[in-house]
């Protein structure tokens, strides 16, 4: 049995699955979960992962601390008694804003459609709760209606996902980074609970207008509802505690398998903060990363380059009032805690939502420069049909959704198992339905094996397999797409220069491949 087969035989996806479930233990909200930036729950989970890395046999295990803004979301419970005397209790999700009551406090609640400026015309919302329906995927982010409500004097905004996210069930809540100030509070309410409130508003208006309104009409458009239901309000009670903590600390947990030949590093990363239970996002990813580390140690692998395993804090959010408030832990790790990683880390393999098939075809998304090498690697794989019937492909460039972007802008070639284009995002992502029920063992097993093999493939290289001609071709394509933005002489000069650079980059990549092939051959001779 060769070393690759030996390590693969040590993969235990049940061990990884159980670790992912154990990560759910610590939570800021005892009902909904949440393991948020700088919170006690995140810190305790980091401590557990620190101990786990040591138990696996990783060396130089550290907690790399950094400054950020934290968030503790303990509860947001809305109570309402309808005209029949039935009391309803709604669990609401939270956003990274400040709002704290002294037990249940009474408020007026109004419904204002999409929460646009036009929806507020003629309505006094000062001190009230404003309920709106938004679609963050196709229209606008939560930050816009929240700030609109704040400017109008509302006590808080309650956002209902009309579509875009949380589509799996009408009871789904949603959470996202607020991308705004902490003093404009917001909460998340499910469509099912919002429907109860809207029905009561409709009944109240119907009674006041001598039954001229059809109280049973639930087929109105959002605009029709906004025009009708804004005429009245409801009495509700809210018990909430959401606290933003400026300038606190968090820690990225790192461990190593020391390299034997170079001071270069191969980085594996995944984040351990979460919304709700966060089983796929990103418990399963952290657990897979450590499951791979465990297999390499148990299998006796001695890497040429040092393997670094990093559980990142604060990926979901970590900065007050910023458009760039996510991937805080990764950004701090590579720019402030370990700027020395720039130039030493030859690849970052980042993991997100890896125990679920997001499409019939799997994909590794990577920076332009690594696309050729990754494609050559995927061509060598046998993909199990029960995991991905249509095999695997390679996509580039990377996107801004995940921590590999922070690594890439620091100059580290990065990859991630592609997750952003599938239906999981519209249905389960950042909702309480991201739990163990969406676990797919065949996918998880394949990803353990695939990325263990990719680590070894990269580790066998003496030079990073970077083909800059892909980058130059992408630049040229963007020029053609935006041709009218350039004067013709400037465009032609730029394109000619790009052709020259592209040819040079292809020659350099050919030489890199030649040297890597000769090095791989020498390793075979040594082993013999």
Task: Describe the residue ranges of each PLM region.
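Conserved small/polar residues in nucleotide/adenosyl-binding loops
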Residues: 2, 524-528
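Mature extracellular/periplasmic domains of secretome proteins
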Residues: 123-125, 145-155, 172-178, 330-340, ...
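Second-shell loop/turn segments in exported
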Residues: 3-10, 30-40, 111, 133-139, ...
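Extracellular/luminal Protease-associated
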Residues: 37, 90-188, 390-393
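Acidic/histidine-rich catalytic neighborhood of metal-dependent amide-processing enzymes
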Residues: 137-148, 249-252, 274-369
């Amino acid at each position: 049995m060769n070393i690759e087969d030996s390590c693969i035989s040590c993969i235990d996806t049940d061990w990884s699955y159980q670790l992912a479930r154990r990560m759910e233990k610590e939570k800021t909200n005892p009902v909904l979960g949440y393991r948020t930036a700088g919170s006690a729950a995140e810190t305790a989970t980091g401590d557990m992962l620190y101990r786990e890395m040591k138990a696996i046999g990783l060396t130089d295990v550290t907690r790399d601390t950094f400054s950020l803004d934290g968030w503790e979301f303990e509860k947001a419970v809305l109570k309402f008694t309808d005209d029949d005397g039935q009391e309803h209790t709604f669990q609401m999700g939270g956003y990274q804003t400040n709002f704290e009551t002294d037990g249940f406090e009474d408020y007026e609640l109004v419904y204002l459609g999409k929460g646009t400026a036009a929806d507020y015309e003629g309505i006094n919302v000062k001190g009230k709760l404003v309920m709106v329906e938004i679609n963050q995927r196709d229209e606008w982010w939560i930050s816009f209606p929240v700030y609109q409500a704040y400017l109008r004097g509302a006590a808080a905004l309650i956002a209902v996902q009309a579509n875009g996210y949380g589509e799996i069930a009408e009871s789904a809540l949603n959470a996202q980074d607020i991308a705004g100030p902490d003093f404009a509070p917001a909460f998340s309410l499910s469509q099912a609970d919002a429907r109860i409130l809207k029905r009561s508003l409709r009944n109240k208006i119907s009674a006041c207008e001598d039954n001229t309104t059809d109280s049973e009409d639930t087929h109105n458009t959002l605009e029709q509802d906004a025009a009708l239901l804004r005429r009245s309000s409801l009495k509700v009670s809210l018990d909430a505690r959401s606290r933003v903590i400026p300038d606190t600390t968090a820690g990225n947990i790192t461990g190593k398998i020391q390299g034997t030949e170079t001071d270069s590093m191969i980085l594996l990363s995944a984040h351990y903060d979460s919304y709700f239970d966060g089983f796929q996002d990103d418990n399963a990813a952290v657990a897979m990363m450590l499951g791979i580390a465990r297999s390499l140690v148990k299998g006796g692998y001695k890497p040429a380059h040092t393997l670094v395993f990093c559980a990142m804090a604060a990926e979901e959010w970590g900065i007050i009032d910023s458009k760039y408030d996510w991937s805080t832990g990764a950004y701090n790790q590579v720019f402030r805690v370990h700027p020395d990683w720039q130039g030493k880390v030859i690849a970052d393999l980042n993991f997100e939502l890896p125990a679920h098939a997001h499409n019939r075809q799997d994909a590794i998304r990577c920076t332009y420069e690594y696309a050729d090498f990754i494609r050559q690697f995927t061509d060598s794989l046998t993909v199990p049909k029960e995991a991905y019937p249509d095999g695997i492909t390679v996509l580039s460039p990377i996107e801004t959704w995940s921590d590999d972007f922070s690594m890439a802008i620091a100059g580290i070639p990065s990859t991630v198992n592609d997750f952003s284009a599938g239906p999981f995002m519209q249905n389960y992502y950042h909702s309480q339905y991201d739990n163990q029920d969406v676990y797919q063992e065949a996918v998880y097993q394949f990803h353990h094996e695939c990325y263990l093999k990719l680590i070894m493939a990269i580790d066998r290289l003496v030079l990073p397999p970077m083909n800059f001609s892909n980058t130059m071709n992408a630049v040229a394509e963007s020029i053609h797409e935006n041709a009218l933005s350039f004067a013709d002489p400037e465009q032609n000069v730029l394109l000619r220069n790009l052709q020259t650079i592209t040819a040079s980059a292809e020659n350099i990549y050919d030489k890199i491949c030649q040297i890597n092939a000769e090095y791989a051959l020498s390793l075979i001779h040594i082993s013999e």
